[in-house]
Design a protein with these regions (language model features):
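Long, contiguous internal "core" modules enriched in hydrophobic/ aromatic residues
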Residues: 1-178
Length: 178
């Protein structure tokens, strides 16, 4: 539920800011999510190149490798492009988290959750770690999950309601419910 809500919010905010289709012609069309000007280019990778370049390269590979994926095929055939709200559903949680980290519109997205960009980033990292442990068969009772900051409103409100404050099991349960 949380993953879909976050993806939907990113896609909606992105389309609002950059448009679902930013060209009058398909001749030189570039999907807005493949346009580096829509990302924060000051964040660098280990080679001192903008992180968004790696992300765009990876997104291009996703598009290339999934030409027969029914939603991609439909939009490409019927509309000539694949909008962000279709594309984002093919991303893993980790890919979506990395996308958020380099977006210029982090504040717009964070506002939907009544969080700061830093709080949402921390929440995404935490959820990504728990999600990966879940997906790969980790034993939760042997895992140590850091307690989330009480300032992260999504989590702290839920924990208060169910009296799970300062509990690793409570943090885990909260994330699973989200």
């Amino acid at each position: 539920i949380a993953e879909q809500k976050i993806k939907t919010t990113i896609a909606h905010s992105f389309a609002q800011k950059y448009g679902p289709f930013d060209s009058t012609s398909l001749t030189n069309y570039v999907e807005p999510y493949l346009d580096s000007s829509n990302y924060n280019r000051s964040l660098k990778n280990n080679s001192n190149k903008p992180q968004c370049n790696d992300l765009i390269k990876h997104f291009t590979k996703i598009l290339t490798d999934n030409t027969k994926y029914p939603p991609f095929k439909h939009y490409q055939t019927k509309h000539g492009h694949i909008p962000i709200w279709v594309f984002i559903n093919k991303l893993t949680f980790g890919e979506m988290r990395k996308m958020f980290e380099v977006l210029k519109i982090q504040q717009n997205i964070s506002n939907v959750f009544n969080l700061t960009p830093s709080e949402l980033r921390s929440t995404l990292i935490y959820l990504n770690n728990v999600r990966n442990d879940c997906a790969h068969g980790a034993n939760f009772f042997q895992q140590t999950y850091p307690a989330l900051k009480s300032s992260i409103k999504i989590i702290s409100d839920f924990e208060t309601t169910f009296s799970f404050q300062n509990s690793s099991i409570g943090n885990l349960f909260t994330c699973l419910c989200l």
